[in-house]
Amino acid sequence: MKEKHSLKYVILVTFVATLGGLLFGYDTAVISGTTGALKSFFIDPLMTNAEAAVSVVAEYRITIGLCAALVGVLLSYFLYKMYSRTKATILSSALFIVGGIILYTQFFNQSDVLDVSMANSIRGFVISSALVGCIVGGAIGGAISTSIGRKNGLILAAILFSVSAAGSGYPDGMNVFGVEMVTSLIIYRIIGGVGVGLASMLAPMYIAEMAPAKYRGTLVSLNQFAIILGMNIVYFVNYYIAGLGDSSWLDTIGWRYMFLSELIPAFLFFVMLFFVPETPRYLVLKDRAEKAETVLNKLVGKTEASHELKEIKNSLTQKDAPWLSYGIGVIVIGILISFFQQAVGINVVLYYAPEIFRNMGASTDTSLLQTIIVGIVNLTFTCVAIFTV
């Protein structure tokens, strides 16, 4: 009876943490329903407003430059972690030189006129800008989890999701940056991306540190299920919102509701996090062993709590060893697997599915319905992977 009680508690805290994964998927896919509005509401009016167009192009270049510099700094940091100072300096210098050349030739050495090519480039960056935030969120996730904790890190992610949803829905009314409206939208999408990056790292970490060993693999895999489920939910939400009016309404008002709909799961995630504890591992790390044992009592029962606490303490014993000395090859293989997973082009489908179907002749409603089918297929084979691997 006690084990059943503990399992129910484990499932409860896992459910709360997987809301972070759900928001990951929700935030990633919500943009797919707004691609048409991004052109008609944000880009097309600039074609007849030369002054605003010049300002948008300038802000776009500055934003691209800042994002590229930030990513370059993060990559350089990891290069210095992995290699000697001399080798890391050479690689970092090469990285910035090549990156600078690409930026100059592709973005800065172009006309200030907002032509069709530049307009498409800006719209494409708006759609994918959250990925910049993902890089930042993923890079700082480790430091966040160590400094303020896994739970507080997830609370921060929930706040970022909420700010992004509200700001993306009203980039004009919440434009506190003093920039053009489309640039304000980009900034809020990047903020949401930081939340995605944090959640993608901290949610599975939280689950892994809370789950008993015999359930850990299954429960952690539920986070991936939640990500795909979040995508499917927002596909249905976008389809429902699109049905509330015609295409003109969708391009002027409806797209706002799509972004704002994320506030509901984000607020739910934020509130529920206050009803779950910090992980025992983090509590031990901060010399709060008694509190850690209290949490373990709820997770595994009193008979196992002392043993689990001892194992956690042993695992945190400091050992002097070079960074990644346990095998850089394993890390490289893991990174390459993730890289090639993205390189197949799945994000193009996730972001542009409705537009792809519209260009094939489907109406707005039909294209969103077809996107739901894509999401269901994605969810189905995610379940196959979870329960067969």
Residue ranges and their predicted role:
Residues 305-314:
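Short, well-structured alpha-helical segments
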Residues 1-290, 295, 314-389:
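Alpha-helical transmembrane bundle of multi-pass membrane proteins
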Residues 302-306, 363:
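Conserved H-loop
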